Amino acid sequence: DQYFKLSEKGTSIQTEILAGLITFFSSSYILFVHPVMLSEAGVPQVLSLLATIFIAIVASLTMGLYANTPLVMAPGLGMTAYFAYTLVGGLGFTWQESLGITIVSSLIFVLLTFTGVIESFRLSIPLELKKAITIGIGLFLVRIGLENAGFLLEDGFNWSWIGFIGLLIVLVLTLFKVKGAFLIAIALITAIFWIFTDGLEVSSTNALLELSNYFDLLDIQFSNMIYINGLIAIFSFVMLLIFQALGIVEAFVEDREEAKKSYQVVSVMSVLSGVFGTSPAITLS
C-alpha cells in the first residue's frame, strides 16, 4: 500500500486482483487475433504469438511497477493493422523490413518522450481532441469485438448468438451491480462455447523447433527505409504511436508524474516489440 498507494486511490488488494482477472480475460483476445493478422503479412504465427506473450508480460509488469499505473500493455490491433495492411500490403515492404521501420519509429518515439517533446505535444492538443482520440480507439476495439463475436458477418453460419448472450449477461449483471460482471460473463460464454462445439483445434506446428530458430526467423532489415516510402512510413508510424499513447494515457492517468512514466514505458516497449518480432505494444486499458 505504501508503494502503490491503494488506499489513497480508493481501492484495495481484493479489488485490484478482481480487476486484474477481468482485464486479463477481456484482453486475451489479442493472443488469437494478433498472430492471425500478422500472418497475413507473412510473419510466422508461432513467432508472433511468442513475441506477443513475452511483450505483454514484460510491458504490463513494467507499467505497473515503474509507472504505478493500472494499464495493461500488449501489441495493439491498430498498429498491427498498419503493419500488416499498410506497410506490407500497401507499400510493399517485407515483414522483416516493416520490423525495421517499427524499431526506428519507436526509437524516435523514445527520443521524443525522454526529451519532453511529447509533453509539449500533449499540452498543445485540445481536451476535446484527446477525448475524441480515446473514443475512436474504443470504437475500433468495439468493432473488432463485434467481428469476432460474429455480429458483422454478412453471410454464412456463425456463433453470433453466443456473443449476444454474453453481451446480455454483462448488461444484466452490470444493471444489478454484480461485482465481476465481465469475468462471470466470460466464464459462462466460454463454457457454452465448449459445450456446443468441439472446442479449439490443436495446431500440429512444432513450436519448440520454431522457437530454437526464433532470431534466425526474424532477420530484421533496415535497408529500404532510407527511401521516400520508408521515410513516409516512419513518420506515419511515429504519429500513430504518439496518438495511441495520448488517447489511452490521458484518459486513465491523472497524475502527471505517473503519466510521464507511462509514456516512457510505452516508448521503450515499442522498441522491444520490434526487436522481438511484433508490432508496437500499446496501452490497451
Regions found by a protein language model. Give the residues of each.
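Hydrophobic, membrane-embedded alpha-helices of multi-pass small-molecule transporters
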Residues: 22-26, 159-167, 179-185, 211-249
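Short, non-helical or kinked segments that cap or interrupt transmembrane helices
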Residues: 47, 67-79, 125-129, 178, ...
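Membrane-embedded alpha-helical modules
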Residues: 91-196
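N-terminal signal-anchor module of multipass membrane proteins
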Residues: 1-68, 86-88
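Membrane-embedded helical hairpins/re-entrant loop segments and their flanking transmembrane helices
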Residues: 9, 38-54, 235-285
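Small-residue-rich segments of transmembrane alpha-helices in multi-pass membrane proteins
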Residues: 27, 79-87, 130-143, 187-201, ...
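Membrane-interface helix-loop-helix modules in multi-pass membrane proteins
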Residues: 63-101
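Transmembrane alpha-helix interface/packing and boundary motifs in multi-pass membrane proteins
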Residues: 59-72, 172-177, 236-237, 268-278
